[in-house]
Amino acid sequence: MREIVHVQGGQCGNQIGAKFWEVISDEHGVEPTGAYHGDSDLQLERINVYYNEATGGRYVPRAVLMDLEPGTMDSVRAGPFGQLFRPDNFVFGQTGAGNNWAKGHYTEGAELIDSVLDVVRKEAEGCDCLQGFQITHSLGGGTGSGMGTLLISKIREEYPDRIMETFSVFPSPKVSDTVVEPYNATLSVHQLVENADEVMVIDNEALYDICFRTLKLTTPTYGDLNHLVSACISGVTACLRFPGQLNSDLRKLAVNLIPFPRLHFFMIGFAPLTSRGSQQYRALTVPELTQQMFDAKNMMSASDPRHGRYLTASAMFRGRMSTKEVDEQMLNVQNKNSSYFVEWIPNNIKSSVCDIPPKGLKMSSTFVGNSTAIQEMFKRVAEQFTAMFRRKAFLHWYTGEGMDEMEFTEAESNMNDLVSEYQQYQDATAEEEGEMDEEEGAME
């Protein structure tokens, strides 16, 4: 029941995805060969959320891997869990998108998309009751952003009533891999606003900061960053996979977190984040988890929640704990920091509790927040976009693939609209809301 089909696209998406499957397989006791060697029936009870049981008791991930060049996929296949995946589920081209959104969305990607959709369809048909899709990709490159958003819109057409959740790595303010990131990201956001249900915003710089500051890693690798992300992905779906006292699923998350359909870009956080060696010496309490989870330093996107207000938030706890304590802490957070929550949505934190903690921890919590501060992120990308677009820099790479300048202008204004929508609700107060309704009534 409640299966999730996982799609990973592009280099970044495949690397995050590969790490994620290591984490999930560890939680469910699945060996790299696909055999089950766990120690508890609970690991098997709902293992079919992410795995198909194949002949001979092997567990095969419901994962689709796509890329426009074979490189990253080869390294996934050669990685520790490479033999876990179904060989037919690797779909790749040979040319690469060359960091060009237009190649991923219109030319190279469009040629490959049908074979990806075939695999997605096959996975979806193997499900009892499909909950939705989760996609890991980055918005700065060509494949993850261009082809990723193309796939999202195609899946949207075919499965309009299923939840579409993406884990999207946004370009970082200080760390840039490619010059044309602002173009690719803006064009992608334009698509994600329309076609995704929930977008978890991740940012390499914020992840680096967590590794440096909190985890005390002097030279964090992408592996370390991806490990943080996969802890979050695992936390978001823990309630689907293990029994809990208060369940949540992707749809409940969407209903509780999205007050207005376009505002579905979330910050995520995870607690406890302790450096690898020192973990086992501390017992964590629910108040400590709560405090750490709402801390700005724990956010995996480089926007500071203290610069905006939370429209809604969701806290998912894992481990043995009293639900009463969880509820008290959630109320406590809202009362103490009431200025950081909009007052026209009372009780705007959803909490859920899952009994089984992740490997190596007694308790953990995952935070998903819909904060107006996320606009900082879009503003930053929009400024960089405008700076280049004013001079039409690098545009020929996109127009050469058949794109029109109009599309850039549209994407830019859509992004600016998004920013002003967030700003509008950040400034709104409970009193104004009533007045606004009256005015609208008068206008009619």
From Swiss-Prot:
Tell me one Pfam family matched here. Tubulin_C
Gene Ontology CC terms, in alphabetical order: cytoplasm; microtubule
Q: Which residues bind GTP?
A: Q11, E69, S138, G142, T143, G144, N204, N226
Q: Write out the GO biological process terms.
A: microtubule-based process
Report the domain of life of the source organism.
Answer: Eukaryota
Q: Which residues bind Mg(2+)?
A: E69
Question: Mind listing the UniProt keywords for this protein, alphabetically?
Answer: Cytoplasm, Cytoskeleton, GTP-binding, Magnesium, Metal-binding, Microtubule, Nucleotide-binding
Q: Enumerate the cofactors the protein uses.
A: Mg(2+)
Record InterPro entries: Beta-tubulin_BS (IPR013838), Beta_tubulin (IPR002453), Tub_FtsZ_C (IPR008280), Tubulin (IPR000217), Tubulin/FtsZ-like_C (IPR037103), Tubulin/FtsZ_2-layer-sand-dom (IPR018316), Tubulin/FtsZ_GTPase_sf (IPR036525), Tubulin_C (IPR023123)
Q: Which GO terms fall under molecular function for this chain's record?
A: GTP binding; GTPase activity; metal ion binding; structural constituent of cytoskeleton
**Where is this gene product found?**
Cytoplasm, Cytoskeleton
CDD domains on file: beta_tubulin
Query: Its biological function?
Result: Tubulin is the major constituent of microtubules, a cylinder consisting of laterally associated linear protofilaments composed of alpha- and beta-tubulin heterodimers. Microtubules grow by the addition of GTP-tubulin dimers to the microtubule end, where a stabilizing cap forms. Below the cap, tubulin dimers are in GDP-bound state, owing to GTPase activity of alpha-tubulin.
Quaternary data: Dimer of alpha and beta chains. A typical microtubule is a hollow water-filled tube with an outer diameter of 25 nm and an inner diameter of 15 nM. Alpha-beta heterodimers associate head-to-tail to form protofilaments running lengthwise along the microtubule wall with the beta-tubulin subunit facing the microtubule plus end conferring a structural polarity. Microtubules usually have 13 protofilaments but different protofilament numbers can be found in some organisms and specialized cells.
In the record, the note on similarity to other proteins reads: Belongs to the tubulin family.
Task: State the name under which the record lists this protein.
Answer: Tubulin beta chain
Organism name = Euplotoides octocarinatus
